[in-house]
Amino acid sequence: MERKTWETHIIQKDLILFRKFIRNVKKDGQVCFDKPFTDKANIKKYLFTGYKKSYYPDNAFDSDSERLFSIILEEDPDVIKWIKPPLNQLGLFWQAGQQYNPDFLVETTTGKYMVEVKASNEIGLDEVIAKAREGIKWCRFASMADPDKKQWEYRLIADDNIHLGNSCKYTLGTARKISED
């Protein structure tokens, strides 16, 4: 018997609304986002506060590179808004019903971006590439439905390309090129 797979893309022209997220943090685990941070091995136990451009004023991160990228987003005058989407709320599936949660959705004065930050030694993994391809498809369909008529683009950025002081545009420009195939 031959197996077939179908892709279904439903374009909703409504806003994507995110619910509140819950994250367990250690006692005294709230840190102002732009202050020096040294406990990088335990970053998942902290909540970073004081964001102005983020959908949420407080954010949690899986890596220090994600935290550094959030600072770049906050400091760049071309960035209008950004969000670190809460787990399993975007509705983006990549394999057999598994959800893909990109690290960031970013709106700048010129475009919109889905951004994934990965360790440089993980950036070529099959799973990472497969998720990136689904992100590229999502961006293509989101561009068709975007009420602002801004193009959505996917960016896969290696952690060693994230440096404070660089602009968002420069950092996005370091992204690995992925084909949609």
Listing of model-derived features with the role each one plays in the protein:
Residues 1-98, 107-113, 118-181:
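Intrinsically disordered, low-complexity, repeat-rich regions
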Residues 101:
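Active-site lining segments that contact anionic ligands and/or coordinate catalytic metals
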